Amino acid sequence: NEYYLSRLGEKAIPCEDAREVLKDLAEVATIAVVSNGVERVQQGRLTASGLAELIDATFVSERMGVTKPNRKFFDSALHILGVNNREKVLVIGDSLRADIQGGSNAGLATCWYNPRGQENASGAKPTFEIARLRDLLPIVMEQEELDDVGNPAKRHMV
């Protein structure tokens, strides 16, 4: 119902270090959110979390017409972003099925965010696994980029 959906997007508690990590990554990468769900709920959550300003693009299944883990979801998002080199893309997520299997279906590297240290009993095989968001930086950034964190003139082009 409408009231329920409007309330869902009002609250969002970002993961520990989310803002700082996104700020660092935004200096060297294009950041896109890919999410199954309802557009206004996901946009509301991003705004409520204070992270929306750090996101370059948002792709939600309601608007995309297909859900993760379908390869078409990722293919469409990459096309809209103008990404030709899939080797420069990393799908990061906490869902082995939607995020990790979905990214793999699209031929993309994946990183499973697993802060609780859960066992992977699925068939999905992440390229990387992290317990803390901060652990993304050395995966995504070259050493020179890690050294340049804080210098916004060093941004990647997709």
Q: What do the predicted segments below correspond to?
A:
Residues 1-2, 111:
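Intrinsically disordered, low-complexity segments enriched in small/polar residues
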Residues 2-32:
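Short, acidic loop-to-helix structural element flanking the phosphoryl-transfer center
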Residues 19, 23, 30-158:
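Asp-based, Mg2+/Mn2+-dependent phosphohydrolase catalytic module
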